[in-house]
Amino acid sequence: LGGKKYRTHQHKEYLSVEDTIPDVQEAINAEQISESQYNSEAVDIEKLKTHLPVVKIETSEEIPGVPYYEEGYSHRKYTTTSEGESELAATMQIIDNLDTYNTVNDKPAVSTSIRIRVRGNTSRWFDKKSYAVTTVDGDGTEQDRRIMGMEAAHDWVLHGPFLDKTLMRNYMAMNFSGELMDFAPDVRFCEVILNGAYQGVYVMMETISRGKGRVDIARPNLTKNVTGYIVEIDNATSLPVSALNNFTKYVSV
């Protein structure tokens, strides 16, 4: 996002369709596939072999930020950690080999502590969650890390395409935008494993934020009356309780 682009075609030259198909079939447990809901046991991660980066996240408890409605309240609330925090301390490893396939047992290119939470608005209700990830050091201080060839930063988004069954819509939109303007987030496809369970194909995304390789504006200077800024339009209203169709089931017509 901003400056030199690192947009890449993620099907590497040494790979072929013939090589990929048998490996994919070997990792899939066909009897565990469901038409109406996700089953993490449908993929045997020990047999997973992919040209996409593999993101492994380990947590000590459920990731906070899942929405729920409480009796007597007309607006939604969000789950917190067992200590009442909105973010959970966790670890993340990224396996991203340059000249061979990626498997869960390969040496990680990135190994870091993180803070993580569920992100989104209505998308928080989807079966496939998206996550806000902050890379930190051992004492919890934000630590910039370069991930999948993108500019070093500490705030990232793991976007889980859900309604878009092609998984490509946001990925393509960001890449097209990046060819037309400077300030479009870089993106990378990846496969996510959470606590040993396969979660599917995700998109690792830069956030729109101030910094080198992001939006190149200076921090506010209290001695000057001119400054750069980013405007964020967010939803600050409390939504009433209502049923949400998350489109997980299909009907033949």
Which residues does each PLM region occupy?
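Phosphate/dinucleotide-binding and metal-coordinating scaffold of catalytic cores
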Residues: 1-253
